[in-house]
Amino acid sequence: MSILPIVTAPDDRLKQKSQPVLEFTDQTRKFMDDMLKTMYHEDGAGLAAVQVGVLKRILVIDIKDHDSVERPKDFYPLFIVNPEMIEKSEELIKSNEGCISVPGQRIEVARPESIKIRYLDYHGKSQELKANDWLARVIQHEYDHLEGKLMIDYLSNLKRDVVLRKLKKLKNNIV
């Protein structure tokens, strides 16, 4: 497995909508394994394919150490391909979020407390998942990436511009 390079804001790829995965191959699964290794390397809770420069509707998530729900031993890591959001609660919960693609920033985002998604798993099998609390938040955060939306898009224009200037400065100092 390989560690993949992370795409960081303000890269234009992060603003594009990701495309569905049309066929499952060994190469698809290897890519998902590489995504997972990259997410662990970056100490993340989730990762979308676009965050490693691939505009495909693939998410990997592992919050087993922070999940408030008792789950089967093999529940994590979650491989979520071509997710569809089929339910969202009306109740919104505000919480601070971080993002591998928006380094050094914590932003308060209001999200539905619970959701239900339909997706394909690691083997291409259709699944449905009801999630609440932290898992629901992580899924929604990563799902936003598939839609070309970043957590900073929940900020006012002024605050978003300040964050983007900081990120550009950080990027210029690294390069």
Curated annotation (Swiss-Prot):
Cofactor note: Binds 1 Fe(2+) ion.
Membrane-crossing segments per the record: none
This protein's record includes keyword Zinc-finger: no
Catalytic residues (UniProt): E142
GO biological process terms, semicolon-separated: translation
Keywords: Hydrolase, Iron, Metal-binding, Protein biosynthesis
Pfam families assigned: Pep_deformylase
UniProt: Fe cation binding residues: C99, H141, H145
Reactions this protein catalyses: N-terminal N-formyl-L-methionyl-[peptide] + H2O = N-terminal L-methionyl-[peptide] + formate
SUPFAM superfamilies according to UniProt: Peptide deformylase
EC nos: 3.5.1.88
UniProt keyword Metal-binding present: yes
Cofactor or coenzyme needed: Fe(2+)
UniProt-recorded Gene Ontology molecular function terms: metal ion binding; peptide deformylase activity
InterPro entries hit by this protein: Peptide_deformylase, Peptide_deformylase_sf
Domain of life: Bacteria
Enzyme class: hydrolase
CDD domains xref list: Pep_deformylase
Family of the protein in this entry: Belongs to the polypeptide deformylase family.
Function: Removes the formyl group from the N-terminal Met of newly synthesized proteins. Requires at least a dipeptide for an efficient rate of reaction. N-terminal L-methionine is a prerequisite for activity but the enzyme has broad specificity at other positions.
Protein name: Peptide deformylase
Primary gene name: def
